[in-house]
Curated annotation (Swiss-Prot):
Taxonomy of the source species: Bacteria, Pseudomonadati, Pseudomonadota, Gammaproteobacteria, Pseudomonadales
Keywords for the protein's UniProt record, in alphabetical order: Cell cycle, Cell division, Cell inner membrane, Cell membrane, Cell shape, Cell wall biogenesis/degradation, Glycosyltransferase, Membrane, Peptidoglycan synthesis, Transferase
Coiled-coil ranges per UniProt: none
Name of protein: UDP-N-acetylglucosamine--N-acetylmuramyl-(pentapeptide) pyrophosphoryl-undecaprenol N-acetylglucosamine transferase
EC class: transferase
Function description: Cell wall formation. Catalyzes the transfer of a GlcNAc subunit on undecaprenyl-pyrophosphoryl-MurNAc-pentapeptide (lipid intermediate I) to form undecaprenyl-pyrophosphoryl-MurNAc-(pentapeptide)GlcNAc (lipid intermediate II).
Biological pathway: Cell wall biogenesis; peptidoglycan biosynthesis
UniProt binding sites for UDP-N-acetyl-alpha-D-glucosamine: 12-14, 124, 163, 188, 242, 261-266, 287
Membrane topology according to the record: Peripheral membrane protein
GO BP annotation list: carbohydrate metabolic process; cell division; cell wall organization; lipid glycosylation; peptidoglycan biosynthetic process; regulation of cell shape
GO molecular function terms attached to this record: UDP-N-acetyl-D-glucosamine:N-acetylmuramoyl-L-alanyl-D-glutamyl-meso-2,6-diaminopimelyl-D-alanyl-D-alanine-diphosphoundecaprenol 4-beta-N-acetylglucosaminlytransferase activity; undecaprenyldiphospho-muramoylpentapeptide beta-N-acetylglucosaminyltransferase activity
Localization annotation: Cell inner membrane
Catalytic reactions of this protein: di-trans,octa-cis-undecaprenyl diphospho-N-acetyl-alpha-D-muramoyl-L-alanyl-D-glutamyl-meso-2,6-diaminopimeloyl-D-alanyl-D-alanine + UDP-N-acetyl-alpha-D-glucosamine = di-trans,octa-cis-undecaprenyl diphospho-[N-acetyl-alpha-D-glucosaminyl-(1->4)]-N-acetyl-alpha-D-muramoyl-L-alanyl-D-glutamyl-meso-2,6-diaminopimeloyl-D-alanyl-D-alanine + UDP + H(+)
Amino acid sequence: MRGNVLIMAGGTGGHVFPALACAREFQTRGYAVHWLGTSRGIENELVPQAGLPLHLINVSGLRGKGKLSLLKAPFQLLRSLLQARRIVRELQPVCVLGMGGYVTGPGGLAARLAGVPLVIHEQNAVAGTANRLLSRIATRICEAFPNTFGASDKRRTTGNPVREELFLETPREPLVGRKPKLLVLGGSLGAEPLNKLLPAALAELPTELRPQVFHQAGKQHAEVTAERYRDAAVEAEVAPFIKDMARAYGWADLVICRAGALTVSELAAAGLPSFLVPLPHAIDDHQSRNAEYLAKEGAAVLLPQHATDAAKLAAQLTEVLMHLEKLNVMGATARRLAKPDATRTVVDICQEVMRG
């Protein structure tokens, strides 16, 4: 083995899945990968499944907390820093890679206090709190979207690490002579505004113009969403979740979804046109900024939730369904914006700082 690498990522799949892609790349290069996380995040399930040792510290976010929590915060941060320092001393990593989540704050500080090179990666077009703070002390800064951190000699625009199977190489079935295929993604929990909006919007389209629909509605909302389609007399297949995203992307001609960083990067990787409805209450409105990356180049249509009703969505769908060549152009533009070497580039940067 060439030494230990400590990856810090926690909370949501948007942080953990790109970090897992980097972990696999480190392993192929002969490094032993360890993971720093918390007991409350999705990493508790996914990291052991990947066969990686998981080290836990106690840390949580401060935004939106009450006064009592804020008073306790300095002591809790000190505790989490001491926990992270102990883990760093035990592992003696040759590099620490922070991929987002609250865990990266104390973990990144512990790494720098120990003199270990620290590389951070920001998945969103707007940097999270921990990464904004760590950018001041990080050895290198990786960003998925251009100019997230402004001008800095330490900054590199790498794109988001995504699963290699999403870079689809097989040509799509021609759109001529068949119904287009619409994939609706509500995320693992389901986006209820999308679950309500799509049946109503599709009901406004003439029957002959309606696409095939596969709608991932979330476990809690799948049954009621299917009922909405039936009530609207719109044919659709509704599922609580999708296990094989590569297959789903390969099936689709158009995607309607939120604008999480990983989703936006996956759409580009798959070369898919999209209608993006950013989560309106996302921290710092980062989903709107993510969506703009594709929309400003013509690879996506940005639809703010507050300004999008069934009639507006139906009009947007009518425009592309009556002019299918637009979908081909949007998809080609999305693929041009993809960064297929993102995972390798992030790991290359880590190796650069290891060598000093």
